[in-house]
Amino acid sequence: MLLALAQWLQGDASFLRLFTYLTFRAVMATITALGIGLVCGPWVIRKLTEMKVGQAVRKDGPQTHLVKSGTPTMGGVLILIGIAVATLLWGDLTNRFIWIVMLVTFGFGVIGWVDDYRKVVYKDPRGMSSREKYFWQSVIGLFAAVYLAFSVSEANNVRVFDLFMAWVRSGLSMGLPARADLMLPFLKSISYPLGVWGFIALTYFVIVGASNAVNLTDGLDGLVIMPVVLVGASLGVFAYVMGSAVYSKYLLFPHIPGAGELLIFCSAMGGAGLAFLWYNTHPAQVFMGDVGALALGGALGTVAVIVRQEIVLFIMGGIFVAETLSVMLQVTWFKYTKKRYGEGRRIFKMAPLHHHFELSGWKETQVVVRFWIITLMLCLFGLSTLKLR
């Protein structure tokens, strides 16, 4: 919004050229989202408390968690407000990637909000059924996947439509330009052509998978938000490189026109996340709930797809991957042993993984900070793929 205003008034005030610089707008988006979160946080927490949207705590979990019962949840709305305002103020609203990421983020946010609302207001511990939640995630994820399949390699929506029609005329058999290939880290001249169907399948898996992985990780005070901020910031760096014809050529990456604008979104997400951490750090005054976790995970997955860094997201988001695998392994092994031996057996003391470490004697803050440190190291490793190729 401010970019368009600056471009309109630029002839009358040369200093407004500052608003055309992507890095300046990224910094301002961070500050804006951070400020909104810090200022509006107490009001949002107070309103959530008045609504009696307290978090229910598992009685079979760590006993130290029982004191968390009743802490306001659905605090993810605070993050989404910060992201929305900062992105709309400082982003280029003609950029198609901004809108598709916003669609996924807020679409998944609505799913999470409905789930949270049913749990805490209607006192239904099940919330949305797994089938219902997965259905709506799939609708949004598939829509984004189909659109991105034809837009990642093209400069504007006219060319996106032309590419789509060419695919239809080919009998749905035509491939995609090389810029839509799956990039392999550390290999500068080797990529894997996915084709349209492969791209759609991978994108769907990344977006929906990332959303649910972040949601599973959200179980301790401050645990999930800092990894989201770190991974989001790292993806913002990739977006800046991919969106720049100069830097992408120098680093031997495919140039993706318009991708650089995602730095604004990632910066807004970082600022909003840090503001939320102010109130979510131990002992938490508010939890983000599904409304925040599903939305942020979907956002990370979508940005990773656009900048063609799905594998790097898997690396940098290693904590999310480990948490998800711990649940899958625990459930699978329990069902298998129950069927074979008549009693269910566990691999971990409790899943997701962070609860296993708690029950192993780690304090909550130790688990959280150590997971942050691991994520920081993984993000630095992921960023190293920019040059080590």
From Swiss-Prot:
Chain ranges passing through the membrane: 25-45, 73-93, 97-117, 135-155, 190-210, 222-242, 258-278, 286-306, 311-331, 366-386
Query: Which cofactor does this sequence's record say it needs?
Result: Mg(2+)
Q: Where, per UniProt, does this protein localize?
A: Cell inner membrane
Functionally, this protein is described as follows:
Catalyzes the initial step of the lipid cycle reactions in the biosynthesis of the cell wall peptidoglycan: transfers peptidoglycan precursor phospho-MurNAc-pentapeptide from UDP-MurNAc-pentapeptide onto the lipid carrier undecaprenyl phosphate, yielding undecaprenyl-pyrophosphoryl-MurNAc-pentapeptide, known as lipid I.
How would you classify this enzyme at the top EC level? transferase
Q: Which reaction does it catalyse?
A: UDP-N-acetyl-alpha-D-muramoyl-L-alanyl-gamma-D-glutamyl-meso-2,6-diaminopimeloyl-D-alanyl-D-alanine + di-trans,octa-cis-undecaprenyl phosphate = di-trans,octa-cis-undecaprenyl diphospho-N-acetyl-alpha-D-muramoyl-L-alanyl-D-glutamyl-meso-2,6-diaminopimeloyl-D-alanyl-D-alanine + UMP
Q: Which GO terms describe its molecular function?
A: metal ion binding; phospho-N-acetylmuramoyl-pentapeptide-transferase activity; UDP-N-acetylmuramoyl-L-alanyl-D-glutamyl-meso-2,6-diaminopimelyl-D-alanyl-D-alanine:undecaprenyl-phosphate transferase activity
Q: How does it sit in the membrane?
A: Multi-pass membrane protein
Q: What is its main location?
A: membrane
Q: In which pathway does it act?
A: Cell wall biogenesis; peptidoglycan biosynthesis
Q: Name one GO cellular component term.
A: plasma membrane
The GO annotation for biological process reads: cell division; cell wall organization; peptidoglycan biosynthetic process; regulation of cell shape
Cross-referenced Pfam families, in alphabetical order? Answer: Glycos_transf_4, MraY_sig1
Q: Which family does it belong to?
A: Belongs to the glycosyltransferase 4 family. MraY subfamily.
UniProtKB keywords: Cell cycle, Cell division, Cell inner membrane, Cell membrane, Cell shape, Cell wall biogenesis/degradation, Magnesium, Membrane, Metal-binding, Peptidoglycan synthesis, Transferase, Transmembrane, Transmembrane helix
Q: What is the lineage of its organism?
A: Bacteria, Pseudomonadati, Pseudomonadota, Betaproteobacteria, Burkholderiales
Name this protein carries in UniProt: Phospho-N-acetylmuramoyl-pentapeptide-transferase
Q: What is its EC number?
A: 2.7.8.13
HAMAP family assigned: MraY
Q: Which InterPro entries match?
A: Glycosyl_transferase_4, PNAcMuramoyl-5peptid_Trfase, PNAcMuramoyl-5peptid_Trfase_CS
